[in-house]
């Protein structure tokens, strides 16, 4: 299993890029490429929807995919923003449930591999060492989810927004200094609210206050965090490994 979760590349103009790197076992990624089918999906296309029969597992080759759940009243909670090399639809592997428990939608044009559940399960079952690597990866995902849930619940609405911005920075950010980071994915305030499990109006007010205090700036939905250290101190950041403090 690839245990290097984050890689820093120094390029011109003093910008430091953080790459999203592969965290699933290489053998599984190779199987998608050799035995899977490649889908090209446009922005706004649903890859699968909550309640649909789950027959395939997906690996993102390029692009970004939003994983979300919706209540009966229509309120949406965004669970993950997944990018290159992320596995989606995997929660039902080795499981008796046959329907998707969430919805996956492309938030930009994407290329996605898909493979049938049975093929991937048998491939993992036949290789005990790969099964161990897969279990380690699943456990990392569980800890990541627990950490995000803790931040959403324990630190109030401001803490939920701050932790979401920190996770977006760790996952997709382009670091210009050790404190300042640009998030290249554009978000509306509604989309940020869905990530924070709060209302758009509340996010509007908090972002406005942060802009006035020069903690962030926003240009056409792209957020630049000017003081990441301040955000971390406000939520009593526990300095989790970067493999855990992520949004994907």
What are these regions (language model features)?
Residues 2-46, 87-88, 92-95, 126:
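Cyclic nucleotide-binding regulatory module and flanking cytosolic helices
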Residues 28-29, 80-143:
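Cyclic-nucleotide recognition modules
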Residues 44, 55-68, 84-85:
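Glycine- and acidic-residue-biased ligand/ion/polar-headgroup-sensing regions
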Residues 128-195:
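Polybasic "coupling" helices that flank or enter modular domains
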Residues 170-248:
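Phosphate-/nucleic-acid-contacting segments
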């Amino acid at each position: 299993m690839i245990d290097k979760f984050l890689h820093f590349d120094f390029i011109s103009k003093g910008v430091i890029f953080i790459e999203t790197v592969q965290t699933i076992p290489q053998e599984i990624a190779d199987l998608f490429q050799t035995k899977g089918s490649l889908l090209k999906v446009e922005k706004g296309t649903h890859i699968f929807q909550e309640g649909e029969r789950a027959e395939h597992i997906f690996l993102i080759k390029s692009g970004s995919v939003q994983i979300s759940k919706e209540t009966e009243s229509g309120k949406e909670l965004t669970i993950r923003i997944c990018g290159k090399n992320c596995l989606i639809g995997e929660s039902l592997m080795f499981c008796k449930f046959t329907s998707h428990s969430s919805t996956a939608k492309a938030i930009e044009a994407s290329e996605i591999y898909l493979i049938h559940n049975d093929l991937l399960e048998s491939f993992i079952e036949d290789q005990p060492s790969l099964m161990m690597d897969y279990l380690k990866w699943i456990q990392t995902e569980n800890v990541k989810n627990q950490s995000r849930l803790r931040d959403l619940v324990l630190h109030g609405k401001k803490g939920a927004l701050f932790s979401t911005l920190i996770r977006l920075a760790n996952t997709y950010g382009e670091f210009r200094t050790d404190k300042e980071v640009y998030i290249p994915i554009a978000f509306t305030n509604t989309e940020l609210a869905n990530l924070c499990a709060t209302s758009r109006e509340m996010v509007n007010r908090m972002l406005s206050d942060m802009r006035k205090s020069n903690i962030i700036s926003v240009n056409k939905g792209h957020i630049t965090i000017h003081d990441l250290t301040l955000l971390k101190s406000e939520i009593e950041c526990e300095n989790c490994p970067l493999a855990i403090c992520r949004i994907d």
